[in-house]
Amino acid sequence: NGRCCHPACAKYFSCGR
């Protein structure tokens, strides 16, 4: 849970995980 591909989200979630 946490599909984000931008820096603001990637710092908490991995892009594509």
UniProtKB/Swiss-Prot annotation:
<dbReference type="GO" id="GO:0099106">
    <property type="term" value="F:ion channel regulator activity"/>
</dbReference>
<dbReference type="GO" id="GO:0005576">
    <property type="term" value="C:extracellular region"/>
</dbReference>
<feature type="modified residue" description="Cysteine amide">
    <location>
        <position position="15"/>
    </location>
</feature>
<keyword id="KW-0964">Secreted</keyword>
<comment type="function">
    <text>Alpha-conotoxins act on postsynaptic membranes, they bind to the nicotinic acetylcholine receptors (nAChR) and thus inhibit them.</text>
</comment>
<comment type="similarity">
    <text>Belongs to the conotoxin A superfamily.</text>
</comment>
<dbReference type="GO" id="GO:0035792">
    <property type="term" value="C:host cell postsynaptic membrane"/>
</dbReference>
<keyword id="KW-0528">Neurotoxin</keyword>
<keyword id="KW-0872">Ion channel impairing toxin</keyword>
<feature type="disulfide bond">
    <location>
        <begin position="5"/>
        <end position="15"/>
    </location>
</feature>
<feature type="propeptide">
    <location>
        <position position="1"/>
    </location>
</feature>
<keyword id="KW-0008">Acetylcholine receptor inhibiting toxin</keyword>
<dbReference type="GO" id="GO:0030550">
    <property type="term" value="F:acetylcholine receptor inhibitor activity"/>
</dbReference>
<dbReference type="GO" id="GO:0090729">
    <property type="term" value="F:toxin activity"/>
</dbReference>
<feature type="disulfide bond">
    <location>
        <begin position="4"/>
        <end position="9"/>
    </location>
</feature>
<keyword id="KW-0027">Amidation</keyword>
<protein>
    <recommendedName>
        <fullName>Alpha-conotoxin-like Mn1.4</fullName>
    </recommendedName>
</protein>
<keyword id="KW-0629">Postsynaptic neurotoxin</keyword>
<keyword id="KW-0800">Toxin</keyword>
<dbReference type="InterPro" id="IPR018072">
    <property type="entry name" value="Conotoxin_a-typ_CS"/>
</dbReference>
<keyword id="KW-1015">Disulfide bond</keyword>
